[in-house]
Amino acid sequence: MTKAASGDTKSTLYCSFCGKSQHEVRKLIAGPTVFICDECVELCMDIIREEHKIAFVKSKDGVPTPREICEVLDDYVIGQNHAKKVLAVAVHNHYKRLNHASKNNDVELAKSNILLVGPTGTGKTLLAQTLARIIDVPFTMADATTLTEAGYVGEDVENIVLKLLQAADYNVERAQRGIVYIDEIDKISRKSDNPSITRDVSGEGVQQALLKIMEGTVASVPPQGGRKHPQQEFLQVDTTNILFICGGAFAGLERIISARGQGKSIGFGAKVADPEERRTGEILRGVEPDDLQRFGLIPEFIGRLPVIATLEDLDEAALVKILTEPKNAFVKQYQRLFEMENIGLTFTEDALHGVAKKAILRKTGARGLRSIMEGILLETMFELPNYEGVEEVVVNAEVVEGRAQPLLIYAEKKGGAASA
């Protein structure tokens, strides 16, 4: 370790971890041969608290309770309290069922796979990923749009099991307790209300192919992936205890639900509902299996997904929280990038609301926040390594609206009114 400071109290002291001087931090704590600043202490405490919370959930005998699962989900996903409760209960019951499967019971507990329904960018994928991290089981994601029936060009459904096996480092026992998330499940809906006359290998055909592995079967998986060959050796993976979570935006499903609710009323006395009166997420909460069938999912496939969790639209306040509060919040990520150049980054409150409003107008949910931030900071990040004497970059509402450039605050102007 290089010497951060000499024994002379008049010399400038530096944090041994981040390298900041005593003038750049609020407190500098001295040890026998090292110094640590208050910012590094705070960062260490955050890491310890996070590790302690995850360890607490994992170390308890049996399975984490739904409340414990929700508490950890709250650190990563903003809002969606109803969906969190549904998922927490379903996951808790699933792994409780596995832990008690060896005991002799007259009642056999069935597996409850989960369907996540919600507008794009509301956190469906993040919820599934975080659940797998909490339970500490192998996790894999698949895109339903790439799947086809066996024998056709495309990805075989059994390749999903192979991906899970790879995530478990080819430990079959661990893979058989894992979680599979299938995204864009609404894109494999049947193309018409009538049963297919011609073969629908990427829609109804994929639903049929998924039935067995979702319910429980012994899948023969080629270790190297790809198509099966008669001379090949296969790994046998039982999918009975693998939890399948399927997610999709189901664009247009709200119209099917609304039409069912309104019935067939016509005439002067009929109530004409304003489509803006109720938000999409609110309407989706009333989804029933018949609505999914009308959308294009076959009854057998719907039956394999008994637990349905619906996600709400994200309003402006929720999007602002997503920008700043989660562990991996976008603002924190960009602040870390700027810190690498020893420059601070500040977003004013009105700037954050401006970013949120843009995302709502684009109808991209939380997923669109990053592209908006990237556009705002592009020129600044291009010049960032060349800045000399700049101590802080401030983004306000005018910058978000494209009417101004970010404010640059220089070190020598820190004492007075900062301007650029």
UniProtKB/Swiss-Prot annotation:
Keywords: ATP-binding, Chaperone, Metal-binding, Nucleotide-binding, Zinc
One term under GO cellular component: HslUV protease complex
Binding residues for ATP: P119, T120, G121, T122, G123, K124, T125, L126
Binding site for Zn(2+): C15, C18, C37, C40
Domain ClpX-type ZB span(s) in chain numbering: 3-56
GO BP of this protein: cell division; proteolysis involved in protein catabolic process
GO molecular function, one term: ATP binding
InterPro entries: AAA+_ATPase, ATP-dep_Clp_protease_ClpX, ATPase_AAA_core, Clp_ATPase_C, Clp_protease_ATP-bd_su_ClpX, ClpX_bact, P-loop_NTPase, Znf_CppX_C4
One Pfam family of this chain: zf-C4_ClpX
The organism's place on the tree of life at top rank: Bacteria
Function: ATP-dependent specificity component of the Clp protease. It directs the protease to specific substrates. Can perform chaperone functions in the absence of ClpP.
Family: Belongs to the ClpX chaperone family.
Quaternary structure note: Component of the ClpX-ClpP complex. Forms a hexameric ring that, in the presence of ATP, binds to fourteen ClpP subunits assembled into a disk-like structure with a central cavity, resembling the structure of eukaryotic proteasomes.
Protein name: ATP-dependent Clp protease ATP-binding subunit ClpX
